[in-house]
């Protein structure tokens, strides 16, 4: 009896020993090249997405900075308005007090004149 052949059978994948294995009829490394190209395409797609996201983050940061500046300016304007409104309120309160004192004085003079006119 003879010993069985030590290498793979001639009809097995890859054919003769020492040759790369792969699907029948496919050139060697085609599938690995295809996988590598797919992976590289995915990496490029992810890199593009990351670039877009970074651009969006930078744009958002710029808009937030501008919004913060506008909010600070608005806060300063509100503080200035509040102080000028308080000054204006005091001014017209004193003006109103002066008017009431003048009306009270005129009323008192009229009452005194009436009293003097009727009792003399």
Swiss-Prot record:
Location of the region described as Disordered in the Swiss-Prot/TrEMBL record: 1-38
Its keywords, alphabetically, are:
Coiled coil, Cytoplasmic vesicle, Membrane, Synapse, Synaptosome, Transmembrane, Transmembrane helix
- What CDD domains is this protein classified in? R-SNARE_VAMP2
Query: Quick one: where is this thing mainly located?
Result: membrane
Taking every annotated instance into account, which residue ranges of this chain make up the domain v-SNARE coiled-coil homology? 35-95
Question: Where do transmembrane segments lie in this chain?
Answer: 99-118
Q: Which Pfam families match?
A: Synaptobrevin (PF00957)
Keyword presence, NADP:
no
**GO CC annotation: what is one?**
neuron projection
Q: Polar residues: which segments have biased composition?
A: 29-38
Protein role? This protein may play a role in packaging, transport or release of neurotransmitters.
The entry assigns this protein to a family as follows:
Belongs to the synaptobrevin family.
Q: What is this protein called?
A: Synaptobrevin
What species was this sequence derived from?
A: Tetronarce californica
Starting at the broadest rank, the lineage of the source organism is: Eukaryota, Metazoa, Chordata, Craniata, Vertebrata
